[in-house]
């Protein structure tokens, strides 16, 4: 953009040339200094036409604005005889003809594209119809899809059931382990209690083992009962010495079951009386040592009587 301006003196005409490739934009006209009240009527001449563009006066309109564009040569003049008139504006590059041709070609292309759009619209309608048919075809196979969905649901249910079975098995395994732990604890406590029971002592006289007693557990108040085995009595030379074993009294004549194992009733104690007889006095003793002790005592008694 280039600024432009000129002075038109009284009674004269000025030619204006925008220049090649430019247009001239007339923006403003102003009246010069004047001592008298004077009016100036302005004219523009293009080719053979002369046009009035405005009037300037010292009192009312000393200047006036325009919005006029010229793309070729023109002439400016006014009617004032005492003062000059000043015109201002600017020049702008004019668009080339090639650009205009491009714009025209674009317009033509747009006009040509209109029927193509219609044809494409028809083709699009055909495509839409074909797509609708394609959509309708899978809709017929919807039962198959439903069956597949049902199969998937059944598979999921089976997996859920299997998971639940696994959790149940794990719970049962834990419960069985806990039961084993409890039973092992009970066995340990029973072993400890059996260790607490006194063991029978061997008799000083004789080599024969005394009768063993068994321990029974009675369900009194959900507690384990203990049966103490008595120690064997010393027979130190007494006649008819025998070991007395305390036998537990069974509850209501029934055997007690512990850990799915029945406990047998205790063995009967051996009868009193020995197996070695004394011929002179027809007495029997448990062992030969007892018989020898008896014979010694008898011999001592006879010697004391003789003395």
Swiss-Prot record:
Location of region: Disordered: 98-280
GO cellular component, one term: nucleolus
Record flagged with keyword Repressor: yes
Biological process annotations from GO: chromatin organization
pH dependence: Optimum pH is 7.5.
Compositional bias of kind Low complexity: 265-277
A GO MF term: hydrolase activity
Control of this protein's activity: Inhibited by 3-(4-Aroyl-1-methyl-1H-pyrrol-2-yl)-N-hydroxy-2-propenamides. 3-(1-methyl-4-phenylacetyl-1H-pyrrol-2-yl)-N-hydroxy-2-propenamide 1b and 3-[1-methyl-4-(3-phenyl-2-propenoyl)-1H-pyrrol-2-yl]-N-hydroxy-2-propenamide 1c are very potent inhibitors.
Swiss-Prot/TrEMBL keywords: Chromatin regulator, Hydrolase, Metal-binding, Nucleus, Phosphoprotein, Repressor, Transcription, Transcription regulation, Zinc, Zinc-finger
Stretches with biased composition (Acidic residues): 98-112, 151-197
Superkingdom of the source species: Eukaryota
Localization annotation: Nucleus, Nucleolus
Biased composition (Basic and acidic residues): 119-132, 198-211
Similarity field: Belongs to the histone deacetylase HD2 family.
Function recorded in the entry: Mediates the deacetylation of lysine residues on the N-terminal part of the core histones (H2A, H2B, H3 and H4). Histone deacetylation gives a tag for epigenetic repression and plays an important role in transcriptional regulation, cell cycle progression and developmental events. Able to deacetylate all 4 core histones.
Assembly with partners or alone: Multimer. Isolated as a trimer composed of 3 proteins of 39, 42 and 45 kDa, possibly a homotrimer with different phosphorylation status or a heterotrimer with HDT2 and/or HDT3.
Protein name: Histone deacetylase HDT1
Organism field: Zea mays
Underlying gene: HDT1
């Amino acid at each position: 953009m280039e600024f432009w301006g000129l002075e038109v003196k009284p009674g004269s005409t000025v030619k204006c040339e925008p220049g090649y490739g430019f247009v001239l934009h007339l923006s403003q006209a102003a009246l010069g200094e004047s001592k008298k009240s004077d009016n100036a009527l302005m004219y523009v001449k293009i080719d053979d036409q002369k046009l009035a563009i405005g009037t300037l006066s010292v009192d009312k309109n000393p200047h006036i604005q325009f919005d006029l564009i010229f793309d070729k040569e023109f002439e400016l003049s006014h009617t004032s005889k005492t003062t000059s008139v000043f015109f201002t504006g600017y020049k702008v590059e004019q668009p080339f003809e090639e650009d205009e041709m491009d714009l025209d070609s674009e317009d033509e292309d747009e006009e040509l594209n209109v029927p193509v759009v219609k044809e494409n619209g028809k083709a699009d309608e055909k495509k839409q119809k074909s797509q609708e048919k394609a959509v309708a075809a899978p809709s017929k196979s919807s039962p198959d899809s439903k069956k597949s969905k049902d199969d998937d649901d059944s598979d999921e249910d089976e997996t859920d059931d299997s998971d639940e079975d696994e959790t149940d098995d794990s719970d049962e395994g834990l419960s069985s382990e806990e039961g084993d732990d409890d039973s092992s604890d009970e066995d340990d406590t029973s072993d400890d209690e059996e260790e607490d029971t006194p063991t029978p002592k061997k008799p000083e006289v004789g080599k024969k083992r005394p009768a063993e007693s068994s321990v029974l557990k009675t369900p009194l108040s959900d507690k384990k009962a203990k049966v103490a085995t008595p120690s064997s009595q010393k027979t130190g030379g007494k006649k008819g010495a025998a070991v007395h074993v305390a036998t537990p009294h069974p509850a209501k004549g029934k055997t007690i079951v512990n850990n799915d194992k029945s406990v047998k009733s205790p063995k009967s104690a051996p009868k009193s009386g020995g197996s070695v007889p004394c011929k002179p006095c027809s007495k029997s003793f448990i062992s030969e040592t007892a018989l020898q002790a008896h014979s010694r005592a008898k011999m001592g008694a006879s010697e004391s009587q003789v003395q």
